[in-house]
Amino acid sequence: KWGDFSHLSIDYYPPTILVTTYKEIEKEEKDSLVDLLSSIPNLQFDSLVLQKRYLKTDNIEILKGEAPSNSYAFEAVERYILNLATPQNIGFFLDMGLGREWLRKNAAGKKVLNLFSYTCSLSVAALKGGALEAINVDMSRPALNVGEKNHRQNNVVGAKFIHYDIMKSFGNITKKGPYDLVIIDPPTNQGASFKVERDYHKIIRRLPEMTNEGAIVMACLNSPYLGSDFLISAFKEFAPMFHFEEKLYSSFSDMEANPEEGLKILFFRKA
């Protein structure tokens, strides 16, 4: 009756539903989607936003209601700013929920380095979990500005926000250490500045000099084409004193046909 919606990502941020598609869908499918979501008992929403990620411009379409403003994601005791009408990432990744939960439970007493921090939700979670300090590094000033707001509205202190091109700033980053916990959560492809297959190992090989004994690395990988073995092999080759300990998948891995094609979060400890 409803058709196949496996090519869509549907996220619910009450009172808004955000639908993301990477290929064009016809009007009939859009109408069917609205009907389907409207038929679900107890699913209350005022706005339905379609984000067309296959387009670079003019890629937001409002299927129901109006464009949302002042939107937030709520997780645990935290609140994060969202921009649900943006043509790019909305400012928060639901699939990283288990990673934030791990930080709340394990970051106490640690000095944290958060590389590719984006809007800094991992820093907020770490500080909520008792981290002593969290240094957030990203090359996007607007993302860091949102990160600062996320910290203020969650009443956490101890964060620093540094606007660096990470691949060109290892010396300065290392000087601010040493660190007890390093988070690496890069985009798969950030144009000329970072590509996972080309550049991830360059960060890994710098870890020994910037970390304390017993330090933990939270290494994230979100490429559908690269599995956990990519990171495990890279650590063995470029930072063999870091031993693999555990792995988490996306918060929605039980819905995925192959969790290895989604978010992978691997933890390594320095011997």
Predicted regions and their residues:
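Non-catalytic substrate-recognition/targeting regions of SAM-dependent transferases
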Residues: D4, S9-D11, K27-F93, E101
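Conserved alpha-helix/loop element of class I SAM-dependent methyltransferases that forms part
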Residues: L94-K110
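Conserved class I S-adenosyl-L-methionine
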Residues: G109-Y118
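Conserved SAM-binding loop of SAM-dependent methyltransferases across substrates and taxa
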Residues: T119-A131
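Conserved SAM-binding motif I beta-strand of class I
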Residues: E133-D138
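S-adenosyl-L-methionine
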Residues: M139-I183
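S-adenosylmethionine
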Residues: I166-S169, I173-P240
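Class I S-adenosyl-L-methionine
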Residues: S228-A271
